[in-house]
């Protein structure tokens, strides 16, 4: 992204279709790449669904941060706690010789509980906000997604890397800055 924004897209060679999956990306980064001639694709899937899931080809500002719209091959729902669930013919039969593990992930109605937190907009685009198991539950009862906080912190130009973790019902942050700002 930095090379693209500094006008050095040529350093990326023939790369013109960056594909992102398995992580949340800053929508502004994706939009910057799209505005600079790249066709950005985001994908979402799971091993338990044989890779089938959601894909986003949208290049517009409103939807570029989404993982996409659902496929006709799958059913999707978001649980009251925000967890994304998927169901369809491509869902695995279960984990090999692990019925307990299978029961934790696939419910009696065939829904795969992904463990990912998401929301869907009025146009049917899904947005991943974090992992259910990573939620920090504060003393006030508020649920905080560390991934969302990390995304906000990483927008600061001097921040190279950061980690947000729970420290006794409070939010703990480790920030690594550029050397000259340490």
Could you tell me what each predicted segment is?
Residues 39, 69-72, 79-105, 125, ...:
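Conserved ATP/PPi-binding loop(s) of AMP-dependent carboxylate-activating enzymes
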Residues 78, 88, 93-94, 117-182:
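AMP-binding/adenylate-forming catalytic core of the ANL superfamily
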Residues 32, 36-39, 98, 105, ...:
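Generic, well-ordered alpha-helical scaffold segments in large soluble proteins
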Residues 22, 45, 68, 116, ...:
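Active-site glycine-centered loops adjacent to acidic/histidine catalytic or metal-binding residues
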Residues 61-64, 91-115, 147-151:
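Conserved ANL (AMP-binding/adenylate-forming) active-site segment centered on the GW(Y/F)…HTG consensus within
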Residues 55-59, 101, 177:
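Short low-complexity, flexible loop/linker segments enriched in glycine and/or proline
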Residues 1-62, 160:
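Gly/Ser/Thr-rich phosphate-binding loop
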Residues 20, 86, 113-114, 128:
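A structural signal for the hydrophobic beta-strands that form the central parallel beta-sheet
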């Amino acid at each position: 992204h930095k090379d693209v924004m500094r006008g050095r897209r040529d350093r990326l060679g023939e790369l013109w279709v960056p594909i992102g999956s398995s992580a949340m990306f800053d929508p502004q980064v994706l939009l910057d790449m799209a505005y600079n001639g790249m066709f950005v694709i985001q994908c979402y899937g799971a091993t338990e669904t044989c890779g089938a899931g959601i894909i986003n080809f949208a290049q517009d500002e409103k939807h570029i941060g989404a993982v996409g719209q659902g496929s006709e091959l799958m059913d999707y729902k978001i649980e009251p706690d925000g967890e994304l669930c998927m169901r369809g013919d491509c869902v695995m039969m279960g984990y090999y010789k692990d019925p307990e593990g299978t029961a934790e992930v696939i419910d009696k109605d065939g829904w795969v509980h992904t463990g990912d937190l998401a929301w869907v907009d009025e146009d049917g685009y899904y947005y991943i906000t974090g992992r259910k198991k990573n939620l920090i539950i504060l003393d006030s009862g508020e649920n905080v997604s560390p991934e969302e906080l990390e995304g906000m912190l990483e927008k600061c130009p001097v921040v190279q890397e950061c980690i947000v973790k729970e420290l006794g019902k409070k939010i703990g942050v480790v920030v690594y800055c550029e050397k000259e700002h340490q």
